[in-house]
Amino acid sequence: NITVGRGIEVGHIFYFGTKYSNPLGAKISNKEGKTEDLHMGSYGIGVSRLVGAIIEAHHDEKGIAWPFQVAPFKINIIASDELLKDDNISKLYSFLIQKYKDVILDDRGITFGKKIKDSELIGIPWTIIAGKNYIESGKFELVNRLTNNNEKKSLEDLEKFDFEKNFS
């Protein structure tokens, strides 16, 4: 059975044979020590096409939903303006940047809601929110971009949490 579907070329292989090696006189020695013409090929992966294919396969009505392993940023911390200078926010950001490298602390001067929408749109796998809940209970909201699951976690919980293992 043949299934017909749409696809995108993300890589290619071209076999040139001896088309280029013969004019150059390029030869190799085989296992028996005999000289043979060199056979050539070209192999490539289109990185920009690969990114497009990943986005095509991993998006929803909110925007991109990057797989954790290839996400340009793994975690986005969103804090209300009055909490941006909070010691726990700084500690959390420092810890996460050392462990995961690709972490954003969104300190743009735009509304809280816009920051959350932007995080969803660009597909950051995890968003940590420090807002009203943090002020009331000292717990952050941890939101999974794929499932939209929202959990309350303390700073200590987040430092122990394995963001890569728990992303699905």
Model-derived regions: residue spans:
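NTP/phosphate- and nucleic-acid-binding module
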Residues: 1-168
